[in-house]
Amino acid sequence: MTLVALCTDSSSLISPAAAAELGVEVVPIPVTLDHEKFDGTTDGFYARMRQGAVATTSVPSPGAFVEMYERAQGGGATSVLSIHLDRRISGVSESAALAARETTIPVRVVSLPTVSYGVGLCVRAACAALRGGATVSTAAVEAERVATTLDNVFVARSAPGGRVPADDEWTILRFAAGEATGLSTHATVEEATAIMGRRILRGRPGLVAVGHAGAELEAAADGLAHDLVEAVAAVERYRVTPSVGAHTGPDSFGAFWWPASR
């Protein structure tokens, strides 16, 4: 019997509850604040950043992936599908590929042209394919296909180290082709929220996922979701946790969207 284990890393923003439900193994992205390992809560992390702490992340070691792959093998898996963010901005998939060469279980490593919760959505699509009887290759292709249907828009007000900048401007960004590009800059978060909503609706989305980093931005995310909920089939919510928030800073919120049919 063929049993495929599905793996990713914590930058996919798959919550522990969702990972357990999907049966997905998640390798943590190491996070530090002021050069010390951080293991606290998401709210505590952003509170420290607002106080001036410098946040950094590092790539999980190949050994961390080897441990995960071998654990999957010990649980009865005969192969592994390991799905990660864009290799153009992170070495995570390269570390996973190095680990794959050190294990006896076959591992397919996929680097997607998306980041953050976009990766999580693709992991979910691969999981659905596997549960439907797909092979590793077919599930990998499905994850890659879904990645091409996704679009995104977000605000990330951060200075070096993810600290909060001194200015009050809110620049709307979009991640594509391995980089984040500024679309427009606004004087208030309310104005940025309205413009983001209009851009999303112009994309004729079927489904939308809205997320936020610091608790202070939850209201902005709520406003964005409210602007969209009557025009789309569903609006999901997610939290930007430290593995991504170390780069965006606490003043960040945004959305991914895709056709209802995907």
Model-derived segments and their meaning:
Residues 50-98, 140:
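Glycine-rich phosphate- or other oxyanion-binding loops that anchor nucleotides, phosphorylated ligands
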Residues 3-4, 77:
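Local beta-strand N-terminus motif with an aromatic residue
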Residues 3, 11-25, 30-32, 92-108, ...:
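Mixed-charge interfacial surface used for oligomerization/domain docking
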Residues 4-64:
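N-terminal glycine-rich anion-binding loop in soluble enzyme alpha/beta folds
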Residues 37-65, 117-139, 206:
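Short N-terminal secondary-structure initiator segments
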